[in-house]
Amino acid sequence: MSSSALIAPAAKEEVATLFVGFELSKSTWLIGLYAPELGKSISRHKVDGGDTDAALELIAAARRRLERLGKPVRVVSVYEAGYDGIWLHRRLTAAGIENRVIDAASIPVDRRSRRAKTDRLDLELLIRMLLALERGETRICRVVQVPDPAAEDAKRQHRERTVLVAERTAHGNRITGS
């Protein structure tokens, strides 16, 4: 589906909404910005992986363009749960952005044909899913419940122990194998 086929959710009140999608990787982040009030296509921008300041400045610039319309601006963002974890969600919400973290396994895939797997297409799909969620289509994908910092810290100790036990086993196997 082309980006020209995007349909914005019904407006609840006179608020301009900026939809932001993040396609995250270790080296670069692809950020898509879509505002129905400004045009029909998604603008794509690349920033270095982990550079939240550059990402937030990009979002702030788009927000300023929307504010010129004279409406209050709401920013909603989305990214797939995975390598970057939850810290980005906390950083975005601290900046006043409504963020959703999507379970990557719940993203619908067309099984009838092989689809190209590119960051650009994935970003488009993420923004389309965000638009659907905003329209109230809750069954389109699963939104991850973000744990509070205390719950996340409780998991960290167990994960570190698992890694250390695996390392110890590997060292023992290497010693007995020689």
Regions found by a protein language model. Give the residues of each.
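Phosphate- and other anionic-substrate recognition elements at nucleic-acid/protein interfaces
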Residues: 1-178
